[in-house]
């Protein structure tokens, strides 16, 4: 309900309470244009109402007849009401002290990092740093992450994060398959690897023909494997000397992957020093809450020879136009949006925000602080080992860092019972053994309580911690010869910012370098950079969500699972499908899971041979990359001159592959920003030839409430909660990529049997390390839907379409809109064709993107899906004022181009070719350009009161790839 201004109500009869309640207030804050602005934009487009515009844009044949069936969430909640409802769910969770371990540990997030990174929109609303000149802050933070990982693992180079430890291990397996022993298809996994890691590896290996063998680590050299995975320390706590084994594996022609605990590596000899080829792991215990499984930043580090085969993103150092150091994403030609099915991985979203948190944890503590934490954890474990031995229990492992396995025999059930009474979780290793893993939050009081549990089970008295500390000096823990002697984190960044004042200023200096949604609109097509409301973000830091172990007993996670069930039903309503799994922790993983589900469906019908996946030429690069990972053969379907799927070519390809057609992958609205009129026909053709229809949900922001893939012929889709449903992009992650399916596919949704999560017996294997993936950020989407309600979610979609058409209409006289539907209308994004400009002026799409930085904008998506174009997506959250500011910038840039075309500006010495302009360049004593300093820095008047300065000039991408350097830059280079 839209309230009148209070001044107009002063002299009237008092309104009822119902009329004054503001349940819709959040929607008015989320949707940028108010009613007057919307009408003004509609007038520009020639429509009387938003409904009339939508009728003209979306084919009537696929329009949703009913309002979103959100059940109890159909009516919007106020921000306070939604927070209270979610708090009630959170309070149903029980926060126990968890010593379960198995790759997840409680941790202290330094308050300065919590407030100034995790809770700071300058960090969490940024996009992936594809435009390096306006991303130097987060690129530096990610470079710190890479340096931290490389130092601690002892390997040459690390990437800028992966999704979780299990998927990182699977990526390492496929990396070694591409580069290793050609005669073998065997990957050997030691039997003390984390069980969730083994399950994800099995899932990944099956469709691409890799045979996974498991057994004792000692037998690995005889396995004739192209790669071997070792855990260091092992899941049960053992710290083993793998030097001789690694040599033997290499001698047999294999390579070694080590899943290593980074905190342990501050005191243990790193894998790179004893011959490992690849190291993977999780950085969660570096200040990132457990969060019921995620999100956390995994890492993958390699020897130098594998650097060009690494999956994921990689930050490298180059120089800018002035020869100064500049950071950028390196080796981007490896990535799926360029190489498609030949990419090194399908990973797109990773875990940038969490990687930044982990790197800042290392910056804040420094090498001495990290080692002190590690030694304290190890000492607590040693005291516990001494204490339980005094109580008559035997430890299974004599060597350990933080984890002990205790032989509890017939008293095992009692130990768990007594622990539960003290609100303590222990790992259930077996019917006769208990696992205990310590972390930085463990205190001497915690240790005393834990010893009391075992004393109660033993019928004895617990030894005091002080007595143990005085008498346990000689307790063995780390194996002789494996103590770390090499230095790490020697770069100045890890040795300077240890006071909170210094840390606060360092974080501020980095965030000031970047352009995120807190400064301006980010009109990236296919990315949906909408509002990430503060009220949606608040629950992420609640301990009732953050301090829950992913493998905690079910009775402790009632609130979490209830919230997850509700969110799944919300997404079922939005998509028109029958069931949803939230396990995939990125869109790429949801896509991959969906294809595995399709394969499982065909196999259940005796048609496992169906392996051809039709993909339109316009598709996002993750589509063919995911199809390849799922063991499918990619067949490209042509698009017509209007950017639509060529129906004749589709029919021909479907007929040609009728016997082995598995699926088609389409994006809707299309990647060209248009609602294709014949989408139902596309689905029918594929179904008629035995295939399933995969509808990529990347553009779901144009469909919610208006149409639904599950209703116009889709069988499976993935969604991007970090696009449509308001999880922030975090500078390149986290994300959530739920997979939604029709009723006939529901029984194939992913399980995680290794941790006791079995959704359906026929379900595919795990695709993420935790049963619910990145569970701790799911409250963001829950809050968004709860506060919007059915009517306002639909209004948001309509406004996104309105905003896109307004931009297209206003810019069409200056830049051709490449594709449009009937009436010249677009969906929620539009493609501006800059190719004619290149012909007439020599100005490239890259030049325009860089020049937009001088105007205070992040560029739209460049050269996707068509080279030489810009794809613009404004979302519903941007006001008309911000849209007009962007339009004015684009028109002004067009006039600058016209000056080149008409000879009034030089083809090389003009403000576009030299963009972006830094403050240092503009204020330098010498100004060598024909255009003025004012035109360079202040091309429009509005910049006089609100100016963003790019911190570096144009980055030299070619130089950076030729001279690959992916470690922290010495201070002297900035002189």
From Swiss-Prot:
Pfam families: GcvP2_C, GDC-P. Its cofactor is pyridoxal 5'-phosphate. GO terms for biological process: glycine decarboxylation via glycine cleavage system. The modification N6-(pyridoxal phosphate)lysine is found at residue 723. GO terms for cellular component: cytosol; glycine cleavage complex. It catalyses: N(6)-[(R)-lipoyl]-L-lysyl-[glycine-cleavage complex H protein] + glycine + H(+) = N(6)-[(R)-S(8)-aminomethyldihydrolipoyl]-L-lysyl-[glycine-cleavage complex H protein] + CO2. InterPro entries: GcvP (IPR003437), GDC-P_C (IPR049316), GDC-P_N (IPR049315), GDC_P (IPR020581), PyrdxlP-dep_Trfase (IPR015424), PyrdxlP-dep_Trfase_major (IPR015421), PyrdxlP-dep_Trfase_small (IPR015422). Its EC number is 1.4.4.2. The keyword Nucleotidyltransferase does not apply. GO terms for molecular function: glycine binding; glycine dehydrogenase (decarboxylating) activity; pyridoxal phosphate binding. The glycine cleavage system catalyzes the degradation of glycine. The P protein binds the alpha-amino group of glycine through its pyridoxal phosphate cofactor; CO(2) is released and the remaining methylamine moiety is then transferred to the lipoamide cofactor of the H protein. This is Glycine dehydrogenase (decarboxylating). The gene is gcvP.
